[in-house]
Amino acid sequence: MTHLPKPRALLGTLAFFVPLMLPTIPAASQDKAATPEKVPVADDVPSAQELSVWIMTYYQRPEPDKFGQRVRQLSARGMLKGNRPEFFTMFLGRVMHAHPERIAGWMEAWKDLPADELEILRNGIWNSQTDAGKQWLRDHKYAELADKPAPPLIAGGPMVLEPYHLDLMWEWFFATGAKEPVLLIVDKFPLNPQDPGDDELPPVPNRQGVDRPTFLRATIGRTAVWSAASLAARHDKLLEHLRAIRTDPRLPPRGKLWLDRVIQIAERDREKNAKT
């Protein structure tokens, strides 16, 4: 059987995923200056690998008190540079969604970051879909972004699926540990054109002689399977969600077969890792 590739960059965001309870911050709309969170930039900034682990395990140990500082550390390490559409905005947005009262203070503390990084942070605010976030955007002359329709992944609206959307789904899970993004990922398993066979993973899609939609569907299906299997070997919460989803009678036959394969790979790798 073909062995599962070791964790690596999925498509975009995961490229850097190497294997504060403050008082409510008054909104600027209340004619009060937002209270900036005091965010020291440590001389000894954690390594890119350490920050990647922090992102991937944030849901296990949420750190709203340190979130502002961590974002500055990501900036210092060059890890807030977007390399695909909607880069990092889902992770930011889901953390901000959990702490809307802090958005104004965080943004005040981040105001000296580079313009391209501030744009990512503003898009994170939009992704939070919170009243406090929308108000901050309006107060700072970004009303058009504030009034933009909610992200389809969050709102459940129609969308043209692209490979980078898997990155957004994983960002969502890393930020929250929620089941919903895992359901969205499992929903992509049936995009694989074949049921599981002798090889462990779906075949690498062949671009030649295939139209773009067909190629993208196969690429998304394969990436969904191997990323889920790889991550479930190390994330208890993810494996727990996958096992729960496995009992859903509405799963399409091909999706169920690939889910069985993902769970099998994850359990095998866990057992192997326990022996080493």
Task: Annotate the PLM regions.
Residues 30-276:
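Non-catalytic all-alpha helical scaffold/repeat segments
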Residues 12-23:
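Bacterial N-terminal signal peptides
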Residues 19, 26, 40-42:
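N-terminal non-cleavable signal-anchor helices
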Residues 21-33:
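Signal peptide processing junction and immediate N-terminal pro/mature segment
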Residues 2-14:
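Bacterial N-terminal signal peptides that target proteins for export
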Residues 1-2, 120:
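Juxtamembrane helix-loop transition sites at the ends of transmembrane segments
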